[in-house]
């Protein structure tokens, strides 16, 4: 179990908040391991001031964003793993409320005899706007990095193959 809490105050202007303000952030993680199962739950609550430009007067309003994530990993056998993740985001600013979710399924295969590795993902996401975007790390080729912001509605999938036929050669 990990818990983090931060209360902060801004005395000078910053991005999307030109008026000084204060806020808080709370993050929690719970992880449970049992034999072939791994289960983790993540929670994040942000309450930050943001500018509201409706009307002639600039004012600061509270922007609350909550994120929930549940991940289950199951070792089917020594070489094959399955990972399921579901995430939900809730956003509130003044009377405006938005939400969004992500669901993905990973299958990961690793062969010891042929030095072959395969990773497959199928993801579905549906959010109301960019405010409720959900970030999901994607496995990539060596030294490649992908951490896209998923928003609106869509399907995303990939298949990575990694084969090492000889000691000094790796094919992706």
Where are these regions (language model features)?
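Exposed, low-structure sequence patches enriched in small/polar residues
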Residues: 1-172
């Amino acid at each position: 179990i990990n818990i983090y809490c931060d209360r902060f105050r801004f005395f000078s202007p910053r991005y999307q908040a030109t008026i000084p303000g204060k806020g808080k952030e709370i993050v929690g993680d719970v992880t449970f391991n049992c034999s072939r199962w791994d289960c983790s739950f993540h929670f994040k609550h942000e309450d930050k001031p943001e500018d509201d430009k409706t009307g002639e007067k600039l004012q600061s309003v509270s922007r609350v964003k909550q994120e929930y994530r549940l991940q289950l990993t199951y070792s089917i056998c020594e070489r094959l793993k399955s990972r399921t993740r579901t995430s939900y985001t809730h956003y509130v600013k003044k009377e405006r409320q938005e939400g969004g979710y992500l669901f993905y399924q990973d299958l990961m295969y690793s062969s010891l005899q042929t030095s072959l590795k395969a990773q497959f993902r199928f993801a579905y996401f549906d959010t109301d706007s960019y405010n409720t975007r959900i970030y999901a790390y994607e496995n990539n080729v060596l030294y490649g990095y992908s951490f896209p912001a998923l928003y609106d509605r869509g399907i995303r999938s990939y298949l990575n193959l990694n084969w090492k036929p000889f000691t000094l050669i790796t094919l992706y």
